[in-house]
Amino acid sequence: MRIGILDEHPEWSRRLIAELEGRGLEVERIDHSEHGFDPRDRRPHWDVVVNRTSPSSHRRGHGRVLFYAEPLLAHLEALGVPVINSVTTWRFEKSKALQVGLFERLGVRYPRTVVVNGVGPLRRAARDVRFPALVKPNVGGSGALIERFETPAELQARAAELDFGPDGVALLQEYIEPRDGAIVRVEVLDGRMLYAIRIVRRSDQFNLCPADLCRVPASDALAACPVDAAPVLDITRHEPPQEAVEQAIALTRAASIDVGGVEYLVGAADGRTYVYDVNATSNFVADAPRVLGFDPFPAFADTIVRAAGRAARVAA
C-alpha cells in the first residue's frame, strides 16, 4: 500500500507520517509547492492520497498552492485515486464565502456577513452589519489579515488600506463577543465526532487561529504549528451539546470533509450559538494524550487505511 500525503508544510504531517510508517506502510510526502503532473499519465501512483493543503500556504511563500491544488486533486480523482478531503473539500476549505453560503443553506446560525470584492462594496456593506465588525480575507489561514473595527466611521477611514488576501475577496462580519472568551472546535473524522476542545485566548493578539491552533508570525511563518499555541491559549477537552455535534457532522458532510473541524462560540450577550468557521486541515491538538486522554493519529491512520482498502476491493 502506497500512501501520498499532499502537504507543502515541512512539519504539519510529521506525526501522521510517523504513525503510518510505524505500521510498515509506504508513505510519500507530496510537496506541491514545487510540483507538476502530466494529464496523459493515467497511472495511479498512490493507493490513497490525503489532502492536507492549507489556505495558510500563501503565508509561507507558497501562494501557488492555493490555485494548483484544485487541478491536481481533480486529476487524481479522475484516475480513481481515493482522496481523503477531496477537491470539493478544498473548495470549501479555501473560501470563507463558500462556507458562509453553506451555513445559510443548512440553516446554521452564524454572524451576519456580507461578501465583497472591493473597497466600494465594503464601504456600502458597512450599512448592513452591526459593529464592532471584522474584515476577514476570503482565503484565510491562521487568522491572518483579520481586522476589527469598532465603528462604521473607523472602517470608512481605513477601508482603502486593507489587504483582502490572495483572491481580493473579503467578508465583513459582525463581531460576536464569545462568552468567557471561549470558542469550541468539534473535530470530525469519517462522519463522527473524534473529540471537541474548548479554547480560551490569553492574549490580546487577534490574528490567532484556534482552528489549527497556531499563529503565523510574519518573521517566522514556519513556526505556525500547534506546539506553539501554548503561550496564547488555554485548551481543554470539552463535551459539546448533542445539537452542536450533529451540526458539526452535518456541515462536514455537506462540505465533503472526511477529517476536519467546525468552530463555534456562544455569544456573551444573547447566549446563542454561532458557527463561524469550517477547517479541513487537522493538525489536532498539541500534546493530545494530556489534553484529550488519547492520541487521535491512530484513528486518522485507520481511516486512511480503510479508504485504500475499499478502493482495492472495488478495483478487484
Annotate each PLM feature.
Residues 133, 194-195, 260, 274-276:
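Protein kinase-like catalytic core scaffold
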Residues 105-131:
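Rossmann-like NAD(P)H-binding beta-loop-alpha module
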Residues 1-4:
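Extreme N-terminal starter segment of soluble prokaryotic enzymes
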Residues 147-252:
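Phosphate-binding site of ATP-dependent enzymes
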Residues 239, 253-257, 266-316:
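C-terminal active-site "lid" helix and adjoining low-complexity regulatory extension at the edge
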Residues 8-112:
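Conserved N-proximal alpha/beta basic substrate-recognition cap immediately N-terminal to
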Residues 173-174, 184, 257-269:
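A short glycine-rich, hydrophobically flanked beta-strand micro-motif that places a catalytic Asp/Glu
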Residues 54-57, 138-140, 281:
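Short glycine-rich anion-binding loops that position phosphate/pyrophosphate groups of nucleotides
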